[in-house]
Amino acid sequence: MKKKALLPLLLGVMVFLAGCDYSKPENRDGFFYNTFYVPMDNVIHWLGTSFNNDYGLAIVVLVLVIRIVLLPFMLSNYKNSHMMREKMKVAKPDIDAIQEKVKRSRTQEEKMAANSEMMEVYKKYDMNPMKSMLGCLPILIQMPIIMGLFFVLKYPSSGGFTEHPYFLWFNLAKPDIWITIIAGILYFLQAYVSSKSMPAEQRQMGYMMMVISPIMIVWISFSSVSALGLYWSVSAAFLIVQTQVANMYYSKLAQREVAPMIEAMEKNKAEASGKGKNTQVVSKKNKKK
């Protein structure tokens, strides 16, 4: 549900990024411009001059620094997501039974009683729904920072990479088809890697992002300076590695931590099954007598 809710939010941000125009001097004012654009522009200029006017390297370093600063939030999100998924496998029979009660309930009191039972199940399996909801936090934290960097690259101030534009094979101040294609491919791969770790019921949304993200990235990059394509390429490459490594590590960690719960559940099932068989045997003996 959380990921489905984020899809329209992300699409809205894409439209916002495409639609805002800081190319005109009279538009360069306001809260967002002064709070996020100006500081990011100053950082880009400082890094560029520090690297002997290599503004391509400055963009790469700045993107990596931002991603590393946000890494603890993202890792916490990965961990909570995997732990919740593994615990849901154990708690699913209890949760399904309570959800059935909610469907059958006719009064508000019955619904409240069922919801109370659900909270007890969450407590029993040490599941905190709030942690899942807080998974949106890293995205919300990084959004104004990333948007500030986006506008600095899309609408550069005088000097900077407009005067020192060359990096690798392309001109940072002009569109470049190859860096645009690279950015599109990397965002497709990033969405694909993310979708692999999603539950089956959410995977369709992941497949939608595999199509929508590259199209939006290519569309915006193709009509913008290639500095923007460089930013997206570096960011996507970092996210691919981050997602793959985090999913591998936290998936195994969650399985190890939840394994005792699964063993206890299987043991309880076996004991219940054994008691049921014993009851049937005793019942048959009594009938024979």
From Swiss-Prot:
It is found in: Cell membrane. Its main location: membrane. Residues 269-289 are annotated as: Disordered. CDD domains: 5TM_YidC_Alb3 (cd20070). Residues 1-19 form the signal peptide. Keywords: Cell membrane, Chaperone, Lipoprotein, Membrane, Palmitate, Protein transport, Signal, Transmembrane, Transmembrane helix, Transport. One of its GO terms (cellular component) is plasma membrane. A lipid is attached at C20 (S-diacylglycerol cysteine). A lipid is attached at C20 (N-palmitoyl cysteine). GO terms for molecular function: membrane insertase activity. The chain crosses the membrane at residues 55-75, 133-153, 166-186, 210-230. The keyword Membrane applies. It is a multi-pass membrane protein. GO terms for biological process: protein insertion into membrane; protein transport. Required for the insertion and/or proper folding and/or complex formation of integral membrane proteins into the membrane. Involved in integration of membrane proteins that insert both dependently and independently of the Sec translocase complex, as well as at least some lipoproteins. PANTHER family: CYTOCHROME C OXIDASE ASSEMBLY PROTEIN COX18, MITOCHONDRIAL (PTHR12428:SF65), OXA1 (PTHR12428). Belongs to the OXA1/ALB3/YidC family. Type 2 subfamily. This is Membrane protein insertase YidC. It comes from Staphylococcus saprophyticus subsp. saprophyticus (strain ATCC 15305 / DSM 20229 / NCIMB 8711 / NCTC 7292 / S-41). The gene is yidC.
